Amino acid sequence: MQEQYRPEEIESNVQQHWDEKQTFKVTEDEGKEKYYCLSMLPYPSGRLHMGHVRNYTIGDVISRYQRMLGKNVLQPIGWDAFGLPAEGAAVKNNTAPAPWTYANIDYMKNQLKLLGFGYDWNRELATCQPEYYRWEQWFFTKLYEKGLVYKKTSAVNWCPHDMTVLANEQVIDGCCWRCDSKVERKEIPQWFVKITDYADELLNDLDKLESWPEQVKTMQRNWIGRSEGVEIEFTVLNSEEKLSVYTTRPDTFMGVTYLAVAAGHPLAAQAALNNPALADFIAECRNTKVAEADMATMEKKGMATGLFAAHPLTGEKVPVWVANFVLMEYGTGAVMAVPGHDQRDWEFASKYSLPIKPVILAADGSEPDLSGSAMTEKGTLFNSGEFDGLSHEAGFDAIAAKLADKGVGERKVNYRLRDWGVSRQRYWGAPIPMVTLEDGTVMPTPEDQLPVILPEDVVMDGITSPIKADAEWAKTTVNGQPALRETDTFDTFMESSWYYARYTCPNYDKGMLDPAAANYWLPVDQYVGGIEHAIMHLLYFRFFHKLLRDTGLVNSDEPAKRLLCQGMVLADAFYFTGSNGERNWVSPTDVSVERDEKGRITKATDNDGNELIYAGMSKMSKSKNNGIDPQVMVERYGADTVRLFMMFASPAEMTLEWQESGVEGANRFLKRVWRLAFEHTEKGPTVALDLDALNDEQKALRRDLHKTISKVSDDIGRRQTFNTAIAAIMELMNKLARAPQETEQDRALMQEALLAVVRMLNPFTPHASFVLWQALGGAGEIDNAPWPQAEEAAMVEDSLLVVVQVNGKVRGKITVAADATQEQVQARAAQEHLVAKYLDGVTIRKVIFVPGKLLNLVVG
């Protein structure tokens, strides 16, 4: 082997070897235990960022470790290739989304290869390819036939800039998450998939996901939002109209003082016909902040409709208001207001001088003070007629029963979850496979006409989707009749909801999935991705798997057994304020800093001499110009160093602070490993290790070796604390570097240790490990080598440190044989100077002995 560690040479050679040998290509093998490790597929934006590198390094470490355990490991990669950014980039660069996307895929694929990830590239897929999305279209038609797909006109969040629909989660502070334009409300026809039909199963099966983060499961439980309550019908006075509301607190029903409906409610529209002020208010509401998260903090506004409803149990007149905090998409689009016992209702009633009626006693049995806020705690009913004196539970049941008896209420289970709107009014997505015949009949595209191919040779004007602008594209013939194709495309979450299954059979052309391959590999054993996907992708991912199961394509209930959500990558952020008052962010690579004795930045300047303000560590982003290009780091230090730093600098699920000094430290460590291996191999072959001939020092070193193997195995396999695994290897390396190399057994032990170290490092630093394994004479290639096994016998201590106490106070520590008896330990303690002086002239009245740990002498 060469004396110097030169990653730029060895990494390209090793990568070429993997390519030529197709080292990571796998097929189904019933004779081997399978392991499917998957990182969330990237969007081909053009360049990898450090967040990608962290995600994929974690997945690769796990995959390589499991491979060394002898498993048949599938680790695929592909491209989530549809999506809005491609359209913007195409307009900006005067091209079409397809060539821009394919060029990015080629570039990023090369970047992934430079990082040495062990992917089965034969399974690579891009979701924008017709051979992929044809099966998504086919599946959609099957869901339609099963009654799980429908079309309805619905109020949506509309981004006027991007001209597309946004999910509620994509509306941040009333603005589009992508372009920051103010979001509007708009009624348009949309296709929906009935995820609500699976709400109970999606909720209950979270309990099966024992190896998913609790935080993700809690977020999904809250998003599904199951509640038990009563749906109640009010009659609008002087009309035949009925108004339905849902409440989880029927025990407070006698405290209703007003009803509130959404701006989009039919009753609101009816009331506005002869009320211009109300019509204006409704228009204002339609363009107000619309994300559900905004509801809690935005100003509550309302206007009386002039309509009244009759309280179903008392007959009292209850005014009907339009309120901006009621959403048409949630529940019935109307709510009953109990301002005495709901804070939002209290704030609204206080603002508009509406009655506030208490109907629940305070905990001490007194009437609650509602002058400053509502009393939201549950308690005993009062001011509620025949229901006075009932507890919360009894009141709930009694009022629900009374409403049911009168035919104006029924118990219901409600969900916060809404059906999945999958229509997007953009071009760069999979066409929705539905057609409309001349007579108005809507039907799925026949199977023999699939895929409905998205034309790729288009001109983008940045405003209208090319397939909407091209009237000819929509024209087709179905069953001999002229028909028009749907010109909306699928939400890109459709593609990313089933890609994991298609990886098991990416070239299968007889169906969506090859059942034999899918059921061999699925479910995914380890999924890796960011927690920001908890309530969108990860919920759709689980939903789609259940749809696949119920179509007979897979035989498991959940798509992934274990989930690891990696933390964000942070970097220093610097800026100076320009003459226009705006912040100009400067890349950390263009900044010179001065630090104090504690390493804190005290001064920063850029290459132009501008004095900079240090904004602290923040997520790497284009907006703060603090992204670090992985390719630059790989060229400077090598892929193994970047990978090692990524896994060492922080626990996988925590944020990682990018520090180039830490990268340099990882590089120095690899050089030390290389140097020790070089010095060892230069001395020639070693003899076999003779365990019986080892002296105490050699036994101690071997004990440390096998304890390290045990710890690293547990840290990677069970605990997934990769940083502590690397720390343990580093600690062992320090001991090996100091170990004597005078005798043949010294060198034989070093040979065993280095072969183990190289294998333990292999998941993290596969290129260097590949070369070092060969240089050390390891059998075969390291990619097929078994993980080192910790020998129990080697880890047994010859001697132990025992704490000696006199009357419960520590007086000394002694080293004794591991199998020493109480008498032997006591005799050895009596010889210890620090202990002996406390035993002079006293009587030992009691001895407390914990073998291998403690001797406590009680004297008097």
Curated annotation (Swiss-Prot):
Disulfide bonds: none annotated. It comes from the Bacteria. Keywords: Aminoacyl-tRNA synthetase, ATP-binding, Cytoplasm, Ligase, Nucleotide-binding, Protein biosynthesis. Signal peptide: none annotated. GO terms for molecular function: aminoacyl-tRNA deacylase activity; ATP binding; leucine-tRNA ligase activity. Its main location: cytoplasm. It is found in: Cytoplasm. ATP binds at K622. This is Leucine--tRNA ligase.
